[in-house]
UniProtKB/Swiss-Prot annotation:
GO terms for cellular component: cytosol. It comes from Actinobacillus succinogenes (strain ATCC 55618 / DSM 22257 / CCUG 43843 / 130Z). Keywords: ATP-binding, Cytoplasm, Ligase, Nucleotide-binding, Purine biosynthesis. The keyword Ion transport does not apply. This is Phosphoribosylformylglycinamidine cyclo-ligase. Its EC number is 6.3.3.1. The lineage of its organism: Bacteria, Pseudomonadati, Pseudomonadota, Gammaproteobacteria, Pasteurellales. The keyword Cytoplasm applies.
Length: 345
């Protein structure tokens, strides 16, 4: 009796589905190309030249995911914007150091490849790359039977950017008297989602049908993370930006001190902006303390920038002309013994 001849597909890996996905995403990937990219998809490695305008180029790299926002997106079958979140989390971390994103790669892992879902995700990744002028040069699609529950997948992103060595933003220029400007977020972005999901569970609501300020709750908690690359790079070019903090995990308390010298503090006026309805709803439904809100969520502020007070009005004009909602939210002061580096009052 002859044994059955087994194939990779019998083991749960469909190479043809993977090939179909590659064909489906090619038009989206093509939208992201930059002149520095050499070759196309399909090589063992992606090739990218450095832009000629840089005299002393320094490469800046970053990697990130979207946390358990992905769980919410999968449960609500909203796959077309989670890729924007993935790109945003990486490129926003690069631009706060003054870097222009050059290229991006993604990792998509699942138990059984659903080509339609994966194509939607990559379409979002490509859109995020377009928004940040970053080339999507490659990625890995891993179909791994037995590793994930049916319908589940995971994402990771990797980005490389470049900055002129003399223009690296490291916070060393921040000084007492600097103004603090906030850039509005689009919602919780991609942080705090384990708490978001817990609040939804405790509240006993269906985010797809629950209405908040005239919109479904699902739409507000899954709003894609704002990408600030183009507006911030323009601001850096036209003003003397001293530092930028990307408000991600750890919120205000942990991210702002990352860009401050040890001898100063950020004093923030919380009446200078309004929390979006989704943050008020989360605080109320979860009975979350003010301190915990500022530690877990961005509370409506995606980035905080420090620059000379004399340039504050000019900076606000530039940012608003670029389509950003921006406010003056505070100032840098000298740090006294025993004080925290972030004071919100």
């Amino acid at each position: 009796m002859s044994k059955q001849s087994l194939s990779y597909k019998d083991a749960g890996v469909d190479i043809n589905a993977g090939n179909e996905l590659v064909e489906r995403i090619k038009p989206h990937v093509k939208r992201t190309t930059r002149s520095e990219v050499i070759g196309g998809l399909g090589g063992f490695g992606a090739l990218c030249a450095l832009p000629a305008k840089y005299k002393e180029p320094v490469l800046v790299s970053g990697t990130d995911g979207v946390g358990t926002k992905l769980r919410l997106a999968i449960d609500l079958k909203k796959h077309d914007t989670i890729g924007i979140d993935l790109v945003a989390m990486c490129v926003n971390d690069l631009v706060v150091q003054g870097a222009e994103p050059l290229f991006f790669l993604d990792y998509y892992a699942t138990g059984k490849l659903d080509v339609d879902v994966a194509a939607d995700v990559v379409k979002g990744i490509a859109e995020g790359c377009v928004q940040s002028s970053c080339a999507l040069v490659g990625g890995e699609t891993a179909e791994m039977p037995g590793m994930y529950r049916e319908g589940d997948y995971d994402l990771a992103g990797f980005c490389v950017g470049v900055v002129e060595k003399s223009k690296i933003l490291d916070g060393s220029k921040v000084q007492a008297g600097d103004a603090l400007i906030a850039l509005a977020s689009s919602g919780p972005h991609s942080n705090g989602y384990s708490l978001v999901r817990k609040v939804i569970e405790v509240a006993g609501v269906n985010p797809a049908t629950e209405q908040l300020a005239g919109k479904p709750l699902a739409e507000q908690v899954l709003a894609p993370t704002k990408i600030y690359v183009k507006s911030v790079l323009e601001l850096i070019e036209k003003t003397d930006v001293h530092a930028i903090a990307h408000l991600t995990g750890g919120g205000f308390w942990e991210n702002i001190p990352r860009v401050l010298p040890e001898n100063v503090k950020a004093v923030i006026d919380e009446t200078s902006w309004d929390w979006q309805p989704v943050f008020k709803w989360l605080q109320e439904q979860g009975n979350i303390t003010r301190h915990e809100m500022y530690r877990t969520f961005n509370c409506g502020v995606g980035m905080v920038l420090a620059l000379p007070q004399a340039e504050a009005d000019k900076a606000l004009d530039i940012l608003r002309a670029a389509g950003e909602n921006a406010w003056l939210i505070g100032r840098i002061e000298a740090l006294n013994a025993g004080e925290q580096q972030v004071i919100i009052r």
